Each structure stands twice: as structure tokens, then as C-alpha cells.
């Protein structure tokens, strides 16, 4: 199987939406590890029952990898795929043994039936067409190979909605499940799990979203990772910011200010036999 040996670029990625998301995540790369508490929590859950072997495709690997603490041998090869070149450049300096591929989950730059298992932790919610991503995973995955996926689903970030902030729209569990063609896939386990992370203050809570390349909107202005050096108090005006902080304090719990995500987890097998 021919694979890129360093950081490579998928020439098919030209859509402005993909480029915009990639730019946001590249800008967030250096600060990603400071804000990825949800990713760590979800990854720990997703890795339970995941058997790493052969050629592993990590979709949306970011600047790190959930396989960092696993023994790497000749029988295990990790291909770290991300749309953000900045993320992969940082990953390559820390994990030089991994193959870094800059590419899009909807147009995977791998040959048919070349991957033994697929892992993706909180990345596929950014797909413009999730059904295209499931079709691509079915194409590159060997018969009997499994895909373990966690995806941010509808109902996430309810606390932000309660504060009057608009957030990215996410697909429901039912819509996500419908994107898997039952002629290609066998469902082994599907579940929706709430995951709550806590923060010392509202600024830290909002930066946790900005720091991983996502965005929220107020009625005044979009808050994105391109403004990562700006103080949130300046974005709405000092008075509005103080009022927003006061409203947020109404939701404080003993652990801090909560932010709850609805995480859809899929364990699916490629139809066509066992490996």
C-alpha cells in the first residue's frame, strides 16, 4: 500500500468551507492541548474496547494522538489524517513514527480496502456531508474492519444557548445513524452520552471552544479562533460582558461552570466477513 511518508496535501481540498475550517484549526494548533479536556474525556471512553492493530486511520488526529501511550510495532501503523496542516506539523514533531496526511474525511486519500481499523474522536461533526464520509470509510476499510467514532451531536452546549449565544448546529443521533448504508455497515454499538466539562470562569469556558477551532456567535459578532488573542470582554462591550458573566454564574456548580456535550458513539463493522 502506497502511503505518504511525511506531511502531504490532498489536492482535492479546494472548497472554501473546508479551507475555512482548516484555517481555524491550524490557528488553534499551538493552544489545542490547553483546551481539549472534552477530547481527552471522550477519547478515554472511545478507546475502551478498541483493538489497535494493522493499519489504523485516525481521522481528525489534531496535534496529538490518542494512541500515544500504546506500543508501536511493525504490526501497527497509525495514519494521522487532519484537514489542518498546522495540526499535523505539530503532531509530526512529537510523533515522528506516525504517517501524517493532510486530507478530508469526505475524500480520503487512501486506496480501497487498505485500512484495518478507523478511529475518530470528535472530528466528523465538521463534515459538510457526513454520508460522504461514511461512504469513504466503507471504501478504504477492509472487510470485517471496525470504525470507532465519537461525534458531537444535537443538544450540545445547552448552557451557551441559555446565555443567548448561538452555536454550531449538530446532527441528531438518528440523522448520523441514517448516514450509514446498511449494505456496507453492521452496527455493533450505538449510544448517545452526555459529557460535561467544567471551567473556572466564563472566559475559560469560551476559550475551550475557541481553542479547538470551533465558534460561537452572539447577537453582535462571531467569536472565532482567529481572534484568539482578543479579550472576550471587548467583543460585546464591557457592560454586556459583565452581564453575561453574571448570568453564567447562575449555572455554577461545585466543580465550576459546566458545559455539556451530547456525544454520539458508534462502533460499526465493515460488511463482508471478519478479520
Swiss-Prot record:
Domain of life: Bacteria
Similarity annotation: Belongs to the methyltransferase superfamily.
Naturally occurring in which organism (per UniProt): Shewanella oneidensis (strain ATCC 700550 / JCM 31522 / CIP 106686 / LMG 19005 / NCIMB 14063 / MR-1)
Transmembrane regions listed in the UniProt entry: none
GO molecular function, one term: 2-methoxy-6-polyprenyl-1,4-benzoquinol methyltransferase activity
Catalytic activity: malonyl-[ACP] + S-adenosyl-L-methionine = malonyl-[ACP] methyl ester + S-adenosyl-L-homocysteine
Protein name listed in UniProt: Malonyl-[acyl-carrier protein] O-methyltransferase
GO BP annotations, alphabetical order: biotin biosynthetic process; methylation; ubiquinone biosynthetic process
CDD domains in alphabetical order: AdoMet_MTases (cd02440)
Known role: Converts the free carboxyl group of a malonyl-thioester to its methyl ester by transfer of a methyl group from S-adenosyl-L-methionine (SAM). It allows to synthesize pimeloyl-ACP via the fatty acid synthetic pathway.
HAMAP family to which the protein is assigned, alphabetical: BioC
Pathway assignment: Cofactor biosynthesis; biotin biosynthesis
UniProt keyword annotations, A-Z: Biotin biosynthesis, Methyltransferase, S-adenosyl-L-methionine, Transferase
Cited PANTHER family: 2-METHOXY-6-POLYPRENYL-1,4-BENZOQUINOL METHYLASE, MITOCHONDRIAL, METHYLTRANSFERASE
EC number(s) recorded for this UniProt protein: 2.1.1.197
UniProt enzyme class: transferase
Amino acid at each position: 500500500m502506497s502511503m505518504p511518508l511525511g506531511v502531504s496535501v490532498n489536492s482535492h481540498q479546494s472548497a472554501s468551507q473546508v479551507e475555512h475550517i482548516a484555517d481555524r484549526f491550524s490557528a488553534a494548533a499551538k493552544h489545542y492541548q490547553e483546551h481539549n479536556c472534552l477530547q481527552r474525556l471522550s477519547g478515554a471512553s472511545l478507546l475502551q474496547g478498541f483493538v489497535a492493530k494493522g493499519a489504523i486511520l485516525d481521522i481528525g488526529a489534531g496535534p496529538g494522538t490518542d494512541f500515544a501511550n500504546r506500543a508501536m510495532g511493525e504490526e501497527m501503523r497509525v495514519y494521522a489524517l487532519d484537514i489542518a496542516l498546522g495540526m499535523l506539523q505539530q503532531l509530526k514533531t512529537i510523533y515522528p513514527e506516525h504517517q501524517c496526511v493532510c486530507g478530508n474525511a469526505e475524500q480520503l486519500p487512501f486506496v480501497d480496502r487498505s485500512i484495518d481499523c478507523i478511529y475518530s474522536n470528535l472530528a466528523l461533526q465538521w463534515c459538510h456531508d457526513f454520508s460522504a464520509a461514511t461512504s469513504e470509510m466503507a471504501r478504504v476499510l477492509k472487510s470485517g474492519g471496525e470504525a470507532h467514532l465519537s461525534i458531537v451531536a444535537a443538544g450540545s452546549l445547552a448552557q451557551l444557548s441559555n446565555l443567548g449565544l448561538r452555536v454550531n448546529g449538530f446532527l441528531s443521533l438518528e440523522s448520523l445513524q441514517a448516514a450509514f448504508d446498511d449494505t456496507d455497515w453492521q452496527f455493533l454499538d450505538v449510544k448517545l452520552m452526555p459529557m460535561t466539562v467544567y471551567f473556572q470562569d466564563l472566559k475559560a469556558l469560551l476559550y475551550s471552544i475557541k481553542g479547538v477551532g470551533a465558534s460561537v456567535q452572539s447577537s453582535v459578532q462571531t467569536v472565532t479562533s482567529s481572534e484568539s488573542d482578543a479579550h472576550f470582554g471587548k467583543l460585546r462591550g464591557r457592560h454586556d460582558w459583565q452581564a453575561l458573566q453574571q448570568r453564567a454564574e447562575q449555572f455554577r456548580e461545585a466543580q465550576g461552570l459546566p458545559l455539556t456535550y451530547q456525544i454520539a458513539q458508534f462502533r460499526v463493522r465493515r460488511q463482508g466477513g471478519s478479520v
